[in-house]
């Protein structure tokens, strides 16, 4: 005989009341009779209620020993319809294609670490892969179009594969995956798995579900605390002398043109200790240069150290403002940079991408006082016009930016500067653009990343402004920006001729096997011939140099993008800096 819902509720209430009075009897005789005909699962459920605490137990303070528990009882929390699925890759091969910024490169190493722990292998050729993963970028429309074009090619490759013998899974990761979500599944029906930047730990499950059921799987949830601090990235190029270390994720600045806060989420920082440990591990692997990464890297604040909870409040540089309340507590970026620099004195340290508002004097002091922290700063201006900067919600004026540049160059006389600029932002007039041109001329940058504005959905600019600058005008302004930048960079680099600089050799020159290329402190490429050189401190011994060697060179020639030098000797950061102080 079946029990109605109301009868079942009455049984549950009766069982709870009986348990709260300490009774050891079961349900009423009539209910007991009904239970005999009920399924075992329902009877077990009622018995558990009887053995557990009653309603009154939640209002009375009792010793834990008086509460009835069943320590040996195990509750199965697994999902029944997934129990038969094996999340392990079992040797399936993964091929990665990375688009966009350095953060995507680091994310790829995190993803491979997660997949490797779950039985996946990496392959270099897409034709050999069981899974092809595109790590995507959504900052500009051009990047998205390249990825869409690549998907068309991969769709054809997938259709040629035998679905039974060697099926191919296509996976989209990163910012484009989060931004477009279901649209990608509808428009690009060849995609099997979509995972946002904060859901990479879920990839083994998503891949298994898609493979088992033949349906697309998606997880693009953003997190308030995921930093992947517990994942040790597996380097994709173990031979490279350089590496990336992610120290924080997300961005709170909410610039009107930028999609990053919507695809990467709110700011959250890794614990300082985990960052230092990863950098030390890289040093043991032979890495000579590490770049600390974050969408707003110098707003880093580690709030896990209790002794630092009441430390200084984060105050923007004078003349700069934020859209959020000042952040308090935690270990600031200056302390992290100092800790990393001291932990690996013979390793170069860089960081990107910062916001100008967070370049405090404490950060500048660390850069000045530690020779292994590169004297190179990225100062993204975006525009040289105050009205455009207001529409962009950058939080500073043209004048404030120029004052910061002057202050930094007084603090660090030989600093190398790089920047980002956007032309053709919503409503930009010719007069406003001329302010950008004059700013580039006035500051003079060693490196610049110049772009025509690309409207992004979900951004404040998309909701509030009109993309009203014609594409031909944008492109014409972009060419003018490039020309002005190159003129300034040429003048800056000409001043380096005759200087001795320390470069880190990264590889063979693309134009000649008889030459190597490396980068100096300002992150400018330097080309040198392959010759035998003395070793620092031993003028009698001579040897060749190669990837991963620090080489002292004298700059002989220059242009806006590349320097050419003469090798002097093999050296290291400490010896080279000591010799420069003597000179």
Curated annotation (Swiss-Prot):
What is the protein name for this chain?
CDK5RAP1-like protein
Q: Pfam families per the record? A: Radical_SAM (PF04055), TRAM (PF01938), UPF0004 (PF00919)
The residues the record assigns to binding [4Fe-4S] cluster 1 are 101, 137, 175
Which cofactor is essential here?
[4Fe-4S] cluster
GO biological processes? mitochondrial tRNA modification; regulation of cyclin-dependent protein serine/threonine kinase activity; RNA modification
Q: Provide the taxonomic classification.
A: Eukaryota, Metazoa, Ecdysozoa, Arthropoda, Hexapoda
Keywords tagged on the record: 4Fe-4S, Iron, Iron-sulfur, Metal-binding, S-adenosyl-L-methionine
Q: According to the lineage, what is the superkingdom? A: Eukaryota
